[in-house]
């Protein structure tokens, strides 16, 4: 009977370790989700700023006169 008791105790220890690991992984997932949400918000702010920018007075490369050829 001692062998069965040892097996049960070993399984209980493994289960406890797995529960701890799952909780640690869950906390990491929560942190990463918060980080992603923050980065998405920052990207949206940058997109808004880029859209609000006035066009540049500098001519585009297509509008520039070509350089003289030698």
UniProtKB/Swiss-Prot annotation:
It holds the Pfam family SlyX. It comes from the Bacteria. Belongs to the SlyX family. This is Protein SlyX homolog.
